[in-house]
């Protein structure tokens, strides 16, 4: 089994500094939502986000959405060999039950995340997604069972993933949940190993897919009759 943690994910509610901006208020009105309870989305709020620190990398719930679809629909998850977690830029930790079916429709996913921020868990009766607040990256890692922490970074040492995963049982893989720049959390000091799997930067869902398929092949080979 392995775990994946999407760190410093750009998933947050609209910051109070920009709730009064026209782009934010207009979109919230169309959706019959309070601006302050709306998910920040660069595709909708880009004009207002110029006023935010690091505004050019924030408001990317789509990255979380695609990552979760790739991970939770993987064969590795279906055979019970994967656990998935999200850490946000504001130090929330989101734990996702492996049986969760993430909406493929993006607006529905955004609505689900807005409910999660408001209620702390969804669905209400039998929660499958749970948020904990005030969890920095170290606290998140401390709550996830693991034997080794592996950070994926373009600056890491190059490895052949098909060979590398053979020594990764019970490992925690950390991937960046942002579109550009560096980790804002001190992830490097938490990692036992920092690796790269390609000569160029890759999207997080591509990296996740490569890890999932290679580890799945390792599991299948290990369980095959000799």
UniProtKB/Swiss-Prot annotation:
The keyword rRNA-binding applies. InterPro entries: Alpha/beta_knot_MTases, Rbsml_bgen_MeTrfase_EMG1/NEP1, Ribosome_NEP1_arc, tRNA_m1G_MTases_N. The record marks 60, 101, 104, 108 as: Interaction with substrate rRNA. It catalyses: a pseudouridine in rRNA + S-adenosyl-L-methionine = an N(1)-methylpseudouridine in rRNA + S-adenosyl-L-homocysteine + H(+). CDD domains: Nep1-like. Keywords: Methyltransferase, Ribosome biogenesis, RNA-binding, rRNA processing, rRNA-binding, S-adenosyl-L-methionine, Transferase. Homodimer. Methyltransferase involved in ribosomal biogenesis. Specifically catalyzes the N1-methylation of the pseudouridine corresponding to position 914 in M.jannaschii 16S rRNA. Its EC number is 2.1.1.-. The record marks 62 as: Stabilizes Arg-60. GO terms for molecular function: rRNA (pseudouridine) methyltransferase activity; rRNA binding. GO terms for biological process: rRNA base methylation. This is Ribosomal RNA small subunit methyltransferase Nep1. It comes from Methanothrix thermoacetophila (strain DSM 6194 / JCM 14653 / NBRC 101360 / PT). S-adenosyl-L-methionine binds at residues 176, 181, 197-202. Belongs to the class IV-like SAM-binding methyltransferase superfamily. RNA methyltransferase NEP1 family. The keyword Methyltransferase applies.
């Amino acid at each position: 089994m392995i775990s994946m943690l999407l760190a410093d994910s750009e998933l947050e509610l609209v910051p109070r500094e920009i709730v009064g901006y026209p782009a934010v208020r207009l979109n919230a009105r169309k959706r019959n939502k309070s601006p302050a309870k709306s998910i920040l989305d660069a595709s909708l709020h880009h004009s207002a986000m110029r006023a935010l620190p690091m505004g050019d990398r924030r408001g990317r719930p789509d990255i979380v959405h695609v990552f979760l679809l790739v991970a939770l629909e993987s064969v590795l998850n279906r055979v019970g060999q994967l656990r998935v977690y999200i850490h946000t830029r504001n130090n929330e930790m989101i734990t996702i039950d492996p049986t969760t079916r993430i909406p493929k429709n993006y607006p529905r996913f955004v609505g689900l995340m807005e409910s999660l921020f408001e209620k702390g868990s969804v669905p209400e009766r039998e929660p499958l997604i749970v948020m904990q607040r005030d969890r920095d990256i170290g606290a998140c890692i401390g709550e996830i069972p693991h034997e080794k922490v592996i950070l994926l970074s373009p600056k890491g040492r190059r490895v052949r993933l098909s060979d590398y995963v053979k020594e990764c049982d019970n490992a925690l893989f950390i991937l960046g949940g942002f579109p550009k720049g560096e980790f804002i959390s001190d992830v490097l000091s938490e990692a036992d190993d920092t690796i790269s799997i390609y000569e160029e930067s890759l999207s997080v869902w591509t990296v996740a897919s490569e890890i999932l398929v290679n580890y799945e092949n390792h599991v299948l080979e290990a369980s095959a009759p000799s």
